[in-house]
Regions:
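Helix-loop "lid/cap" segments that line or gate small-molecule binding pockets
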Residues: 29, 47-61, 114, 148
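Conserved SAM-binding loop
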Residues: 15, 100-103, 136, 160
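Short phosphate-binding/catalytic loops that engage adenosine nucleotides
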Residues: 96-98, 176
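Metal-dependent phosphoesterase signature
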Residues: 38, 54-91
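Asp-based, Mg2+/Mn2+-dependent phosphohydrolase catalytic module
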Residues: 1-5, 91, 107-109, 113-213
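Short, surface-exposed acidic
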Residues: 33-43, 58-69, 122-125, 155
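Alpha-helical elements of Rossmann-like donor-binding domains used by nucleotide-donor carbohydrate transfer enzymes
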Residues: 24-28, 51-55, 88, 92, ...
Length: 213
């Protein structure tokens, strides 16, 4: 058994315990504009803002601007709290010389809020991929294949950490080993995509994870 060379992390619900906050934000938005489709707040998890607008608010630039302003204000006041044990886990990866990157559907503007709250955030990762880097949104595998390509390794030499259904589908399509975070979906749902499921990073050993794949 050998270590995986690269660990790729989604952001919300994987690095930060923020996914429930976004669910409430988008639930309020869709209650206003799609009152008969309550499932949409969950269905969009893992998608870029551009994709959401193209899919649900196409040709409505004024409404898009209004939602963007609300989202920016929401994120400006958001507290980005790490998922339990994450900081110790990322240090563990560095000690094992495992390359690390964020693969998020969030945009660069939001990431500035992250960097302001956590000045050491960039030091945890070798690279941060954002929505602007992706030609296609999750569940397409593009973003995770890009992550593997950036480090010059095969997808099977990576391990991806995800929490959303669109994220699970993206990783699976990239033929990449998947660790599911049980922060956003019930275990029985995550089980459809991976049997490697963790509630957080407390007492998680990377070598043990690698031994499973």
């Amino acid at each position: 058994m050998s270590y995986k060379k690269v660990a790729l992390f989604d952001l919300d619900g994987v690095v930060f315990d923020t996914e429930p906050l976004y669910t409430e934000f988008w639930r309020a938005v869709f209650e206003r504009y799609y009152p008969n489709e309550p499932q949409l707040a969950t269905a969009i998890k893992g998608q870029t803002l551009t994709w959401i607008y193209e899919r649900y608010f196409a040709d409505l630039p004024d409404l898009q601007n209004k939602i963007t302003e609300e989202l920016n204000a929401f994120e400006h006041n958001m507290q980005f709290e790490y998922v339990l044990g994450f900081e110790d886990f990322i240090v563990q990866l560095h000690q094992l010389n495992v390359n690390t990157a964020v693969v998020t559907s969030s945009n660069k503007q939001k990431m500035q809020q992250v960097y302001t709250q956590h000045p050491n955030f960039k030091a945890y990762f070798d690279h941060v991929f954002t929505a602007e880097d992706f030609a296609k949104s999750k569940p397409d595998p593009y973003c995770y294949l890009l992550g593997a390509s950036y480090f010059g390794v095969k997808p099977t030499e990576c391990v991806a950490f995800e929490d959303s259904i669109n994220g699970f589908k993206s990783v699976t399509a990239a033929t990449m080993p998947l660790v599911g975070l049980a922060t956003s979906n019930p275990i029985e749902v995550i089980n459809q995509y991976t049997k490697v499921i963790i509630p957080n990073y407390l007492q998680v050993d990377f070598t043990d994870l690698c031994a499973v794949f």
